[in-house]
Amino acid sequence: EPKEKDGKLTAGLGAGGHWDPKDTKQHGYPWQDDAHLGDLPALTVLHDGTAANPVLAPRIKHLDDVRGHSLMIHAGGDNHSDHPAPL
């Protein structure tokens, strides 16, 4: 279900925050042990909206670990930082 922020309903907010079972409270690279497990590798999406290249998530060992969680795909790049700057 969507959640409200600043008076506007936003579908993505219903997914919750990054998956962070180790309680690191920081963003990082997918292979970095001291970052959210929810920080995944970049997904290459073509102009027609399809994504066919495999993505490896080296720190996720079992599919059961992510069962019941949402997968959010953001548009644009990622600088893997808690203090984003323009890319």
Curated annotation (Swiss-Prot):
<feature type="binding site">
    <location>
        <position position="39"/>
    </location>
    <ligand>
        <name>Zn(2+)</name>
    </ligand>
</feature>
<feature type="region of interest" description="Disordered">
    <location>
        <begin position="1"/>
        <end position="33"/>
    </location>
</feature>
<keyword id="KW-0862">Zinc</keyword>
<dbReference type="Pfam" id="PF00080">
    <property type="entry name" value="Sod_Cu"/>
</dbReference>
<comment type="subunit">
    <text>Homodimer.</text>
</comment>
<keyword id="KW-0574">Periplasm</keyword>
<comment type="similarity">
    <text>Belongs to the Cu-Zn superoxide dismutase family.</text>
</comment>
<dbReference type="GO" id="GO:0046872">
    <property type="term" value="F:metal ion binding"/>
</dbReference>
<comment type="function">
    <text>Destroys radicals which are normally produced within the cells and which are toxic to biological systems.</text>
</comment>
<dbReference type="InterPro" id="IPR001424">
    <property type="entry name" value="SOD_Cu_Zn_dom"/>
</dbReference>
<feature type="binding site">
    <location>
        <position position="18"/>
    </location>
    <ligand>
        <name>Cu cation</name>
    </ligand>
</feature>
<keyword id="KW-0560">Oxidoreductase</keyword>
<feature type="binding site">
    <location>
        <position position="74"/>
    </location>
    <ligand>
        <name>Cu cation</name>
    </ligand>
</feature>
<dbReference type="GO" id="GO:0042597">
    <property type="term" value="C:periplasmic space"/>
</dbReference>
<dbReference type="InterPro" id="IPR036423">
    <property type="entry name" value="SOD-like_Cu/Zn_dom_sf"/>
</dbReference>
<dbReference type="GO" id="GO:0004784">
    <property type="term" value="F:superoxide dismutase activity"/>
</dbReference>
<keyword id="KW-0186">Copper</keyword>
<feature type="binding site">
    <location>
        <position position="18"/>
    </location>
    <ligand>
        <name>Zn(2+)</name>
    </ligand>
</feature>
<protein>
    <recommendedName>
        <fullName>Superoxide dismutase [Cu-Zn]</fullName>
        <ecNumber>1.15.1.1</ecNumber>
    </recommendedName>
</protein>
<keyword id="KW-0479">Metal-binding</keyword>
<keyword id="KW-0049">Antioxidant</keyword>
<feature type="binding site">
    <location>
        <position position="27"/>
    </location>
    <ligand>
        <name>Zn(2+)</name>
    </ligand>
</feature>
<feature type="binding site">
    <location>
        <position position="36"/>
    </location>
    <ligand>
        <name>Zn(2+)</name>
    </ligand>
</feature>
